Design a protein with these regions (language model features):
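Acidic/His-rich, divalent-metal-binding segments that scaffold phosphate/diphosphate chemistry
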Residues: 7-71
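Conserved active-site and cofactor/substrate-binding residues in soluble primary-metabolism enzymes
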Residues: 12, 16, 32-36, 74, ...
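Predominant activation on well-ordered alpha-helical scaffold segments within soluble catalytic domains
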Residues: 18, 22, 35-42, 77-80, ...
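Charged/polar positions within long, soluble alpha-helices
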Residues: 46, 128-131, 192, 196-199
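Divalent metal-dependent catalytic cores for phosphoryl transfer on phosphate-bearing substrates
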Residues: 50-156, 166
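A structured, mid-to-C-terminal "fold-capping" secondary-structure block
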Residues: 142, 146-203
Length: 203
């Protein structure tokens, strides 16, 4: 059920957030990941009853890895400085940094939105890697059973932490299968838009 605590509104627009992202990220892989997580977060906002906060959720997803390309060793630690300089509010900075909880920072995901980001971030990478192995190169025809096999194969997309994904599902109170199913649907919702943008993207 939806939490009763009112979520904050973003202090920057989506366009401003994207310009901020591009200021520190040029690699097409990182841009694609940011856009994918943005789309996933927007889908989850609507799915979980936070449609009025879709923009906020999306911007959190868009900016969640803002410091990773230039400062990989300081991930989620350098982010507050970059975000604050870009006009991002403290609440959003907290939410963004919370996806590194227990990995690189001690900022705990508390709100449902933060738990969704924590759970889905690594998983989108695993799903994307699995999609590239398919003839279609797409999530549109991906089934949960196929993803489960890839999840169990620790050598596949080894950089995507299974432990983080499991912990994320537990924090949400979901079974892994539900997280897989929902995140596949979320990625289907934005795949076309992300592909269209990346087809014309130039760093």
């Amino acid at each position: 059920c939806k939490e009763t605590t009112k979520m904050r509104e973003s202090k920057i627009t989506r366009d401003e957030a994207f310009e901020l992202l591009k200021k520190y990220n040029k690699d097409p892989f990182h841009i694609r990941h940011a856009l994918t997580v943005e789309g996933v977060m927007r889908w989850y906002a609507k799915e979980l009853g936070y449609a009025d906060e879709e923009e906020y959720w999306g911007i959190v997803g868009l900016l969640h890895d803002i410091d990773f390309e230039l400062y990989p060793e300081e991930h989620c630690k350098k982010a507050p400085e970059l975000l604050k300089a870009g006009g991002v509010g403290d609440d959003m900075i907290y939410s963004i940094c919370s996806h590194g909880y227990g990995i690189c920072v001690d900022v705990e995901p508390v709100h449902e939105m933060e738990k969704v980001l924590f759970a889905s971030d690594e998983l989108t990478g695993l799903i994307w890697s699995a999609a590239l192995m398919r003839p279609s190169k797409s999530v549109m025809d991906m089934e949960v059973s196929s993803l489960k096999k890839k999840f169990k194969d620790k050598k596949f997309a080894a950089g995507c932490s299974r432990d983080v994904i499991r912990t994320g599902a537990e924090r949400l109170g979901w079974e892994l299968e539900k997280l897989f199913e929902q995140t596949i649907l979320a990625m289907r919702s934005c795949e076309s838009d992300v592909n269209s943008f990346m087809g014309t993207y130039q760093a």
